[in-house]
Amino acid sequence: MGDECSNPDLLAEPGSSPPWDHGNQRQEAANESNTRVPRVLKAHLGPETAQPTKRSKRNRWRRQSCQGPSPARSGQFLGSADLGLQRGVLKSAARTCLSEISNSTRASPESAQSTDPGRAARPRTRTLPTPHSFKIGEEAEEMKKKKERKRRKERKKERNFKK
């Protein structure tokens, strides 16, 4: 059997640049991200050549649109095609940001919807009871009972006095 690897580019001396290396690092990174690497080769070449997943791209777009452009893209000149692509990406990212915000601030399903047109504009949300509010409620009940007892006693005295 001969050499396992018959590719002349891979047999070049170590340390010398391969024949396809003729650009700066930014262009090289852009070229690598555009080329698809077969799944079998990914295991041999390592994680740096693996394609980013859709989820990681989406998360990067969300971060970029919600927190402003990344420093790597800010110094880069954008062509008209790039701007169109970026506009679409920003629109979808803004949509996801807005949907996340609306999901987190949506009114609770048990909120009372009033039929009064003046109140309908502002939905009322019920606050969750805390131990402190329970205590306040109990104290209020006790005060009502005390007042009621006093009233009864006074009425009883008045009845007895009249007799």
UniProtKB/Swiss-Prot annotation:
Coiled-coil residues: 134-163
Protein name stated in the entry: Coiled-coil domain-containing protein 140
Source organism superkingdom: Eukaryota
Region (Disordered): 1-79, 100-163
Biased amino acid composition, Basic and acidic residues: 135-145
Polar residues bias: start-end ranges: 26-36, 100-114
Biased composition (Basic residues): 54-63, 146-163
Keywords: Coiled coil
Low complexity bias spans: 115-131
